[in-house]
Amino acid sequence: VTPVLISDTGLAAEVAALINRVYSDAEKGIWLEGQSRTSEAEVAELIATGQIAVARSGDRVVGSVRVHEIEDGVGEFGMLVAAPEERGTGIGTDLVSFAENWGRERGFAQMQLELLVPQTWEHPVKEFLRGWYTRIGYRLVRKDDLETAYPFLVPHLACPCDFLVFRKILDPSK
């Protein structure tokens, strides 16, 4: 499974459905019922601007990640998903490696990711991800209040949340 950037906006519905399916489980209890992580229109726009990479198994999209530049010399990845039936097969690792290589190819010194976490309880998926990102070299650089950074999201939350910002120095020789 080799992740690749895609340009076919016809895949937007399939990619959006996968993202929403994974996030509805991975962020259970964080969002009010009925909230979606993304939409077909948003994913189509991200595909059209070269920001979505997918991993395929045969004809099926089994994983995806969004990549983009957030500031000079810093890339970011997000919306990282692997189909639940494919977990443990290395798709997530392959997608993160793709994102980091995408950043290196553009001469970025760092990659960033943001992790939404509840303020008052530990979410098992979020704690797993926090540990995994740390094991693969990402370091927590700051904790931001969601209300300040993304106030438009707050009405959709089921509980107060922070987001954790992680960064990794990219070794250009890899």
Residues covered by each model-derived region:
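Conserved GNAT-fold acetyl-CoA-binding loop/helix
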Residues: 20-43
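A short helix-loop-beta-strand connector motif used in the catalytic cores of GNAT acetyltransferases and
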Residues: 42-54, 159
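Conserved acyl-donor/pantetheine-binding loop and adjacent beta-alpha core of acyl/acetyltransferases
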Residues: 45, 74, 126, 142-161
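Conserved beta-strand in the GNAT
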Residues: 54, 60-68, 74-81
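Conserved acetyl-CoA-binding loop of GNAT-fold acetyltransferases
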Residues: 130-143
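Conserved acetyl-CoA-binding loop-helix of GNAT-fold acetyltransferases
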Residues: 82, 88-105, 127, 135
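Conserved GNAT acetyl-CoA-binding A-motif
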Residues: 103-125
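A short beta-loop-alpha structural element at the N-terminal edge
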Residues: 1-17
